[in-house]
Amino acid sequence: MKIALGIEYDGSRYYGWQRQQEVKSVQGCLEEALSKVADEPISVFCAGRTDAGVHATGQVVHFETSVQRKDAAWTMGVNVHLPPDIAVRWVKTVDEGFHARFSATARRYRYIIFNHRYRPAVLANGVTHFHYPLDEKRMHQAAQCILGENDFTSFRAVQCQSKTPWRNVMHINVNRYGHYVVIDIKANAFVHHMVRNIAGSLMEIGCGNQDINWMAQLLALKDRAKAAATAKAAGLYLVAVDYPVQFDLPCAVMGPLFLADDLI
């Protein structure tokens, strides 16, 4: 039997998604909890491996098991065995052709900037603080040049292991909600640090350090050294993963929960 789960987590206490020896990972905690409920070893596969300090409200995983359990066991039952900063949001039995990573057609991220003179305490690990005023309209206008299929070498981590820097960005929007500036981006896939590198450069434009056309120039240069520094991990959330309609996976509010449910 193959089962898919929707997972939410605060990544600030973890060394990323991927299971590692001697350090705490989200995957490791989830597999341990699932194995207790299944009473057999469980290995999970995810839609996107997030880095240390990165969060998710819409991570999707799948696993295979030989045991029969009620849906409540895979949600509330597993949550009992998880730390408070990881939670299962939904469960769905899927057909054998489903794969959390390879069946996905797009991933969506939100980068949350707390744009205020003073840094936050309660959400210190849930947002990126930027104390200079940001012009979100300039940021949105500048970002539109990356739509479509492009070579993202300028926004790709040096250690990225992807075979190609080409990705297809389906939308990127920058909006303000009070003191929060939200960069919302969806693409077929992302190269390593792509969202955080884009966010770092957009903040340079938003505060007036760079012109609106700087993003287009960076894209054309294909040189990581020319772009801004990588933005912090704290503000980044994997909020949704798209799949073909045939799998009929549940929908959940993208969040994060401290933002309004009806964001654009």
Curated annotation (Swiss-Prot):
Q: Which family does it belong to?
A: Belongs to the tRNA pseudouridine synthase TruA family.
Give the InterPro entries listed for this entry. Answer: PsdUridine_synth_cat_dom_sf, PsdUridine_synth_TruA, PsdUridine_synth_TruA_a/b_dom, PsdUridine_synth_TruA_C, TruA/RsuA/RluB/E/F_N
Keyword Isomerase annotated:
yes
Catalyzes what? uridine(38/39/40) in tRNA = pseudouridine(38/39/40) in tRNA
Gene name per UniProt: truA
Q: Which PANTHER family match?
A: PSEUDOURIDYLATE SYNTHASE, TRNA PSEUDOURIDINE SYNTHASE-LIKE 1
Quaternary organization = Homodimer.
> Which residues of this protein are catalytic?
51
Is Isomerase given among the entry's keywords? yes
Pfam family, any one: PseudoU_synth_1
The Enzyme Commission number assigned here is 5.4.99.12
Q: What is this protein called?
A: tRNA pseudouridine synthase A
Please list the residues that bind substrate. 109
MF annotations from Gene Ontology? RNA binding; tRNA pseudouridine(38-40) synthase activity
Keywords tagged on the record: Isomerase, tRNA processing
Cited SUPFAM superfamilies: Pseudouridine synthase (SSF55120)
Give the protein's function: Formation of pseudouridine at positions 38, 39 and 40 in the anticodon stem and loop of transfer RNAs.
BP GO terms, sorted: tRNA pseudouridine synthesis
